[in-house]
Swiss-Prot record:
Official protein name in the record: Glutamyl-tRNA(Gln) amidotransferase subunit A
Source organism: Streptococcus thermophilus (strain ATCC BAA-491 / LMD-9)
NCBIfam families in alphabetical order: gatA (TIGR00132)
One MF term in the entry's GO annotations: glutaminyl-tRNA synthase (glutamine-hydrolyzing) activity
Reactions catalysed, as given in the entry: L-glutamyl-tRNA(Gln) + L-glutamine + ATP + H2O = L-glutaminyl-tRNA(Gln) + L-glutamate + ADP + phosphate + H(+)
UniProt xrefs under Pfam families: Amidase (PF01425)
Active site location: K77, S152, S176
Known EC number: 6.3.5.7
Lineage summary: Bacteria, Bacillati, Bacillota, Bacilli, Lactobacillales
Gene3D superfamilies per record: Amidase signature (AS) domain
Keyword list, A-Z: ATP-binding, Ligase, Nucleotide-binding, Protein biosynthesis
Coiled coil: none
Any one GO BP annotation for this protein: translation
Assembly and binders: Heterotrimer of A, B and C subunits.
Amino acid sequence: MSFNNKTIEELHNLLVSKEISATELTQATIDDIKAREEAVNAFVTVAEEAALAQAEAIDEKGIDADNLLSGIPFAVKDNISTDGILTTAASKMLYNYEPIFDATAVANAKAKDMIVIGKTNMDEFAMGGSGETSYYGATKNAWDHSKVPGGSSSGSAAAVASGQVRLSLGSDTGGSIRQPAAFNGIVGLKPTYGTVSRFGLIAFGSSLDQIGTFSQTVKENAQLLNVIASEDAKDSTSAPVRIADFTSKIGQDIKGMKIALPKEYLGEGIDPEVKETILDAAKHFEKLGATVEEVSLPHSKYGVAVYYIIASSEASSNLQRFDGIRYGFRAEDAKNLDDIYVNTRSQGFGDEVKRRIMLGTFSLSSGYYDAYYKKAGQVRTLIIQDFEKVFADYDLILGPTAPSVAFDLDTLNHDPVAMYLADLLTIPVNLAGLPGISIPAGFAQGLPVGLQLIGPKYSEETIYQAAAAFEATTDYHKQQPVIFGGDN
């Protein structure tokens, strides 16, 4: 029996009334994963034994009636550490790495009796926008298996969209939650930088990385964020949680809300059908009582260039720790210490990871630092200032999540620049440390279109308010791919 069409609140009521047990729900989730996994390849590891053991322990002590997520299974992106469960970052380099600790976000969820069901596939070390750079093979889009699911949190998005799990965690460095959420027609939130601890997240770009949430609905997304958000002494960049309940404004109307629509977000390079869908969504917000006005974010056009200098520079530093000495893969054909380093990194990293390490090393090198890295930091400040000017007069920014719908597998992965441009609309949010959400807003060419809502720092409850108002008066979130029902 499958429970994948039940809401979290419905599942909670079933668990509290003992109509089902946490063990039965966990086994049903494992069955849902197995029934769909061959088609979508969303998981690197299904932690069947550990999940069932955790569920049995929860059943033994009893479901907490006051804890909505008690006994609920969830999936975790494979770059987020899980105690005793393989955490590979979808790389040969960490093919056998089993952490002895949980990331703070995972520990927070487990403390609320949530059950880790498995680790989801992703672009290697979170470097990619299509889900195709994984050592474990490409994840497929839940709606059309010939299309990419987006990246880098490809498996976390596809798992929710295909009905394998109801909730999952991902990470977002330049759009890695919002873009796959858009491509798969689900809800994905990147919180304000520092809202969720990065302790236990395998680092890519430390000034950009943020753990976030995937779900079927806006309210469930906020409910999961309530659990994982926390200040953490183990992460010096974490911030006090300023919102007691991220669901607090859900259900409130948005009359009088001022929403900005940047002209740059609907300009050159945006698919005409995507543009039309977003303009229709803007009109819908106006019908709900909001004011939508065109604004300009003039420096957003430099976002991709700035991001790939800063993120690659940080990655080249962060990935120095993977050397074949301490953990993970080690090349066997080494004659000396230098050979171990060179051969291990040459054989252990995929092409995209190597490309970004080389780009970052070049940007930080003597003679080029001022021209590239320093200049990128200065332009990053201009991008931040653009947002600050808009948010002085507006509550939120609206636009498409991605320039297009999901594209064909094995097309852009041979053209790095074209692939990088797919993150054009999400990258500025990371550069500024802002919260952003993608919600389903319609379809183009039979594939989901994502609407992105961006707010000032620590405005997640307002973002959820507007997103929920849109969701409550449309039915895009109710439409599911064929595979969700088990047929393929």
